[in-house]
Amino acid sequence: MLERIKDSFTHSIQTKIDASEALPESIAKAAEMMVHCLLGGNKILACGNGGSAGDAQHFSAELLNRFEVERPPLPAIALTTDTSTITAIANDYSYDEIFSKQILALGQPGDILLAISTSGHSGNVIKAIEAALSRDMTIVALTGKDGGPMAGLLSINDVEIRVPSNSTARIQEVHLLAIHCLCDNIDRTLFPQDE
C-alpha cells in the first residue's frame, strides 16, 4: 500500500514535469485572452462534470473572491452550482443541455467559456461549447487524453490546454495547477505587485 501511494506521487510529479514542457504557452495565451475579456467588461463562464465541476467552481471562486493578492472581485460564473436550474433543464429537456441553455441566456459576445473535461467527450460540455460559439464567445478548454470531440470544435481563436496524460486523476491534478496559473497570471497582469 505504501508503494502504491509513493507511485501516485511519482506519477503525479512526472505528469506535472511533462505538462511544464507542453502547457505554458497555452496557459499564457489563455490568461491573456481572459485578461482582455475582463478589461473589455465581459465575464468568464465555467463548466464541467464531477471533479471538473469542482474545478469550474474553484476557478470562479478565485476570481470572484481573490487568489493570492488583494484585489477587486472579477466576473466569473460557474454554471455548475444552481441545482434548481440544472435539474429543471435535465428533467424538462436533457442532461446534455444543462450548460448550453444557461450559456444561451447568460453568454454575450466577448465572454469566455472555460470548458473542462478530462476526456473531451462530455456531451453537455460539448453542447456548451457549441452554444458559446453561437454567442460569439471564445473557448478555453481544459482537456486530457486525445482531447476528444471538444478539441475538434475549437478554432485558432480558442485555446486548448491538453494535459499529456491518459490518467483521469493525473489530468485533474494538472487542471487544478493550470487553473492556479491562470488566476496568478490574471492577477499579476491586472494588478501588478512589487515583488
From Swiss-Prot:
The keyword Isomerase applies. Belongs to the SIS family. GmhA subfamily. Substrate binds at N49, G50, G51, E62, N91, D92, S117, T118, S119, S122, Q172. Residues 34-195 form the SIS domain. GO terms for molecular function: carbohydrate derivative binding; D-sedoheptulose 7-phosphate isomerase activity; zinc ion binding. It is found in: Cytoplasm. Pfam families: SIS_2. The reaction produces a racemic mixture of D-glycero-alpha-D-manno-heptose 7-phosphate and D-glycero-beta-D-manno-heptose 7-phosphate. Gene3D superfamilies: Glucose-6-phosphate isomerase like protein, domain 1 (3.40.50.10490). Binds 1 zinc ion per subunit. This is Phosphoheptose isomerase. Its main location: cytoplasm. Catalyzes the isomerization of sedoheptulose 7-phosphate in D-glycero-D-manno-heptose 7-phosphate. It catalyses: 2 D-sedoheptulose 7-phosphate = D-glycero-alpha-D-manno-heptose 7-phosphate + D-glycero-beta-D-manno-heptose 7-phosphate. It comes from Shewanella woodyi (strain ATCC 51908 / MS32). Its cofactor is Zn(2+). PANTHER family: DNAA INITIATOR-ASSOCIATING PROTEIN DIAA (PTHR30390:SF6), SEDOHEPTULOSE 7-PHOSPHATE ISOMERASE / DNAA INITIATOR-ASSOCIATING FACTOR FOR REPLICATION INITIATION (PTHR30390). Homotetramer. The gene is gmhA. Keywords: Carbohydrate metabolism, Cytoplasm, Isomerase, Metal-binding, Zinc. Zn(2+) binds at H58, E62, Q172, H180.
